[in-house]
A protein has these predicted regions:
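Flavin-dependent oxidoreductase catalytic core characteristic
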Residues: 1-177
């Protein structure tokens, strides 16, 4: 992915301009429907990934591959973005079923991992900029995206409900979603 970004195959510049619009429009993707906070969290994770990748490439260029810890944090953000997007899509496709468990799982997962994305991004930006030297535009975007990534979800309460439903079912109800 880094190679494709460096060669211009992925269009990072175009996506970054979309991220600028996203951040200047109140960090709202325009999504309407169930699980809006989760959808916005996922979009914010993609945006923060693009900004972190761009700033990493600006600092390290083609030597970015040598920065293993930085690459690990970038990968963690990307893995969350993909897994959460895929999970939410499956839940929305099967939303007509009476089972609320998948929806609860996606709410807990996205809320819990969104907080981790903020931590990963903060580590990346702290390695690129001195804590007091982060450019104002990057800091403003980070602060806006942080609000979308940090959901006001009762993760513990949701996990209790998931546990209770699992016990009621006599184990994890394994279904193909």
């Amino acid at each position: 992915m880094i190679t494709k970004t460096l060669t211009g195959e992925l269009g990072l510049r175009e996506y970054l301009s979309q991220v600028d619009n996203y951040c200047s429009n109140g960090v709202d993707s325009g999504y309407v429907g169930d699980y809006k906070p989760e959808a916005e969290c996922i979009e914010a994770s993609k945006a923060i990934y693009a900004i972190a990748l761009n700033e990493s490439l600006n600092k390290y260029g083609q030597d970015i591959g040598l920065e293993q810890v930085l690459m690990e944090n970038l990968a963690n953000i990307l893995i969350f973005s993909y897994a959460a997007d895929s999970t939410l899509s499956r839940v929305l496709q099967n939303n007509s079923k009476a089972d609320e468990l998948p929806g609860l799982c996606v709410q807990a997962y996205v809320a819990e991992e969104g907080i981790k994305v903020v931590e990963y991004a903060r580590k990346i930006f702290n390695s690129i900029f001195d804590s007091s030297n982060m450019p104002k535009d990057i800091k403003d975007k980070f602060d806006k995206l942080d609000k979308r990534l940090t959901l006001d979800t009762d993760i513990i309460g949701i996990k209790k409900v998931i546990g209770e439903k699992t016990v009621e079912a006599g184990g994890y109800p394994v279904k193909n979603y």
